[in-house]
Amino acid sequence: MSWRLWLKSKPKSVNLGFYGEVNAGKTTLANKIGKDWADQEVGVVSEIPHETRSIQKLEKVNFAAKGTKLDLTLIDMPGIASSVNPKDFMRHGLSANEAMERAKEATRGIVEAIKYLENVDVALVIVDATRTPFDQVNFTILGNLEHQSKPFIIVPNKIDLPEADIRLVRDAFSEYPVVPVSAIQGDGIETLYDKIAELARKMR
């Protein structure tokens, strides 16, 4: 395709879903992509667990990499957890009532995120590279993605931190595409963009 035809070609619409454990950096990465390509952020980042308790979207993100133009919708999912304990919120200063309500919202968000997977075209599975990747949550997410034949990328995040262990994540998910990044520093982000474009090109 000539560059003139490429400029005129209509971008492919892609729903890009951000999945992962609580506080793995999903929203930080979604915000990074949103700022890079649309000068907008998707959601609020917080140290309090389950800050994202409902699906958040940023539409009409004009993305281009490796000769591929995409019309992205960034879909930031609530963090997935095997259980939600109100005490985790109380440790961050919330009252008992506030913590209980937040726990209910977080639980609903987890269910919503899994159900919404059918609407996702490509998924980024964000893994905290400073924690063990051998967590049931990660394998639950991957199992759901594979069951629905969704293309995805494993994204070890926080690689700028000294305790990050990229090799361990690669070993844990050796059969899958793995692209390490630092969502805060921007390390590895261009490689991730290329991989997103590559998967999108293979979509029907």
Regions found by a protein language model. Give the residues of each.
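Active-site-proximal flexible loops/turns
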Residues: 38, 83-86, 135, 164-167, ...
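Charged, alpha-helix-enriched surfaces in structured cytosolic catalytic cores
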Residues: 24, 50-53, 108, 186-187, ...
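Conserved nucleotide-binding/hydrolysis micro-motifs of P-loop NTPases
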Residues: 51, 79-81, 130-132, 158-162, ...
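Conserved, well-folded catalytic cores of nucleic-acid-processing
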Residues: 36, 61, 80, 148, ...
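Conserved G1/Walker A P-loop phosphate-binding module
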Residues: 1-93, 97-98
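Canonical P-loop GTPase G-domain recognition
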Residues: 15, 158-204
